[in-house]
Regions:
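Sec/Tat-exported extracytoplasmic proteins
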Residues: 61-68, 86-89, 117-122, 141-148
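Short cysteine/histidine-rich zinc-coordinating motifs and their immediately flanking basic loops
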Residues: 94-100
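Short microdomains enriched in Cys/His and/or Lys/Arg
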Residues: 103-115
Length: 155
C-alpha cells in the first residue's frame, strides 16, 4: 500500500499547525528560551542568588544547627553531618544522577539520594523536594562538583 499520498498532506498540516503555534507564542509575554543575551547586571543577579543558596547549602552540608533551625529541618539526629561521610564533597557524584541507586534499590534523583542519606545514616527527617533546604543542599553539591562531566545513569 502506497502511504506517500497520505503522508504528505499530514506533514503539511502538521507543519502549518507548528508554524501557527510558534507565531502565537511570539506575540505573548512568555519568554521563549532567551530571546536576547542576558545583560551583565542580570547575570550578576542570577549568580548572587545562586551563591546565596550555595552558602546556605554549605552550612547545611556541614551540620550548621542554626541554619537547620532557621529552615525548620532536622538533617541528623546522630550528630553526623553530610560532610562527615563526604569531606570536601567527595564521593557525591551529582553528575551521575538520575540513576539506579543500589542502596535504595530504585531509580533515583539527587534529591532522592539526599533524603535517603538524611533518613538512613543520619536518622534525620526527610525534607520536601521543593524546600529551600533541598534547593540549598543541591546548589552546594552541584557547585562543589562543577567541572565534572555530565554522566547520568553511570556509577
Amino acid at each position: 500500500m502506497d502511504t506517500s499520498k497520505r503522508t504528505l498532506p499530514l506533514f503539511v498540516a502538521g507543519t502549518a499547525v507548528a508554524g501557527l503555534l510558534i507565531l502565537l507564542g511570539l506575540g505573548s509575554e512568555q519568554a521563549i528560551a532567551h530571546k536576547r543575551p542576558h545583560t551583565a547586571e542580570e547575570l550578576k543577579v542570577f549568580n548572587d542568588v545562586f551563591m546565596e543558596y550555595v552558602v546556605l547549602g554549605d552550612k547545611l552540608f556541614h551540620g550548621d544547627a542554626k541554619a537547620q533551625e532557621e529552615l525548620g529541618v532536622t538533617l541528623s539526629k546522630t550528630g553526623m553531618a553530610c560532610a562527615m561521610c563526604h569531606p570536601s564533597n567527595v564521593d557525591v557524584h551529582p553528575n551521575e544522577f538520575p540513576k539506579y541507586q543500589e542502596q535504595m534499590q530504585e531509580f533515583a534523583t539527587l534529591r532522592d539520594m539526599i533524603n535517603w542519606c538524611i533518613e538512613k545514616p543520619n536518622q534525620g527527617e526527610p525534607i520536601d523536594s521543593d524546600s529551600e533546604a533541598m534547593k540549598a543542599l543541591e546548589a552546594y553539591i552541584y557547585w562543589s562538583s562543577r567541572g565534572s562531566p555530565l554522566a547520568p545513569g553511570t556509577h
